[in-house]
């Protein structure tokens, strides 16, 4: 292979690695956002239940202090 061909192959490999890295970072960001939203929803439901006496009596495992 000539020098130009080797340089072209090198650039293609770098480009492919960059694209794979970028898309995997974006996917992990999406999972983190989903986990944070799930945690926030759970905390909101727990807080609303624990502030309601009837719900607190029926669900003591939810309102247990940690």
Curated annotation (Swiss-Prot):
Phenotypic consequence of residue 53 to A: 17.7-fold and 50-fold decrease in inhibitory potency on alpha-7/CHRNA7 and alpha-3-beta-2/CHRNA3-CHRNB2 nAChR, respectively, and complete loss of activity on alpha-4-beta-2/CHRNA4-CHRNB2 nAChR
Residues cleaved off as propeptide: 22-44
InterPro entries the record matches: Conotoxin_a-typ (IPR009958), Conotoxin_a-typ_CS (IPR018072)
Region annotation (N-terminal tail important for activity on alpha-3-beta-2/CHRNA3-CHRNB2 and alpha-4-beta-2/CHRNA4-CHRNB2 nAChR) ranges: 45-48
Site entry: Important for determining subtype selectivity: 54, 57
Subcellular location: Secreted
Effect recorded for residue 57 to I: No change in inhibitory potency on alpha-4-beta-2/CHRNA4-CHRNB2 and important decrease in inhibitory potency on alpha-3-beta-2/CHRNA3-CHRNB2
Entry-linked Pfam families: Toxin_8
Span of the signal peptide: 1-21
Record's keyword terms, sorted: Acetylcholine receptor inhibiting toxin, Disulfide bond, Gamma-carboxyglutamic acid, Hydroxylation, Ion channel impairing toxin, Neurotoxin, Postsynaptic neurotoxin, Secreted, Signal, Toxin
Disulfide bonds: 49-55, 50-63
Outcome of swapping residue 56 to A: 3.2-fold decrease in inhibitory potency on alpha3-beta-2/CHRNA3-CHRNB2, 13.2-fold decrease in inhibitory potency on alpha-4-beta-2/CHRNA4-CHRNB2, and 10.7-fold decrease in inhibitory potency on alpha-7/CHRNA7 nAChRs
Modification comment: Gamma-carboxyglutamation of Glu-48 seems to be not important for nAChR inhibition, since synthetic peptides without this modification do not show change in inhibition of alpha-7/CHRNA7 and alpha-3-beta-2/CHRNA3-CHRNB2 nAChR and show a 2.3-fold increase in inhibition of alpha-4-beta-2/CHRNA4-CHRNB2 nAChR. Hydroxylation of Pro-60 seems to be important for nAChR inhibition, since synthetic peptides without this modification show a small decrease in inhibition of alpha-7/CHRNA7 and alpha-3-beta-2/CHRNA3-CHRNB2 nAChR and a very important decrease in inhibition of alpha-4-beta-2/CHRNA4-CHRNB2 nAChR.
Residue ranges, annotated region (Ser-Xaa-Pro motif, crucial for potent interaction with nAChR): 51-53
Effect upon mutating residue 59 to H: Loss in inhibitory potency on alpha-4-beta-2/CHRNA4-CHRNB2 and very important decrease in inhibitory potency on alpha-3-beta-2/CHRNA3-CHRNB2
Residues carrying the site annotation Key residue for activity on alpha-7/CHRNA7 and alpha-4-beta-2/CHRNA4-CHRNB2 nAChR: 56, 58
Modification 4-hydroxyproline occurs at: 60
Residues bearing the modification 4-carboxyglutamate: 48
Effect of residue 57 to F: Loss in inhibitory potency on alpha-4-beta-2/CHRNA4-CHRNB2 and very important decrease in inhibitory potency on alpha-3-beta-2/CHRNA3-CHRNB2
Effect of residue 45 to A: No change in inhibitory potency on alpha-7/CHRNA7, 4.6-fold decrease or small increase in inhibitory potency on alpha-3-beta-2/CHRNA3-CHRNB2 (depending on experiments), 2-fold decrease or no change in inhibitory potency on alpha-4-beta-2/CHRNA4-CHRNB2 nAChR (depending on experiments)
Annotated consequence of substituting residue 52 to A: Important decrease in inhibitory potency on alpha-7/CHRNA7 nAChR, no change in inhibitory potency on alpha-3-beta-2/CHRNA3-CHRNB2 nAChR and complete loss of activity on alpha-4-beta-2/CHRNA4-CHRNB2 nAChR
Domain notes: The cysteine framework is I (CC-C-C). Alpha4/7 pattern.
UniProt record similarity statement: Belongs to the conotoxin A superfamily.
Role played: Alpha-conotoxins act on postsynaptic membranes, they bind to the nicotinic acetylcholine receptors (nAChR) and thus inhibit them. This toxin reversibly blocks alpha-3-beta-2/CHRNA3-CHRNB2 (IC(50)=3.1-5.1 nM), alpha-7/CHRNA7 (IC(50)=4.5-5.1 nM), and alpha-4-beta-2/CHRNA4-CHRNB2 (IC(50)=128.6-390 nM) nAChRs.
Extra remark: The mutant [V62N] (V18N) shows a very important selectivity for alpha-4-beta-2/CHRNA4-CHRNB2 over alpha-3-beta-2/CHRNA3-CHRNB2 nAChR. Negative results: does not inhibit neuronal alpha-3-beta-4/CHRNA3-CHRNB4 and alpha-4-beta-4/CHRNA4-CHRNB4 nAChR, and muscle alpha-1-beta-1-gamma-delta/CHRNA1-CHRNB1-CHRND nAChR.
UniProt protein name: Alpha-conotoxin GID
Annotated source species: Conus geographus
Top-level taxonomy: Eukaryota, Metazoa, Spiralia, Lophotrochozoa, Mollusca
């Amino acid at each position: 292979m000539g020098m130009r061909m080797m340089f072209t192959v090198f650039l293609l490999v770098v480009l492919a690695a960059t694209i794979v890295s970028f898309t995997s970072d974006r996917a992990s960001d999406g999972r983190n956002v989903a986990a944070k939203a799930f945690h926030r929803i759970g905390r909101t439901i727990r807080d609303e239940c624990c502030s309601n006496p009837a719900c607190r009596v029926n669900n003591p495992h939810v309102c247990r202090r940690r």
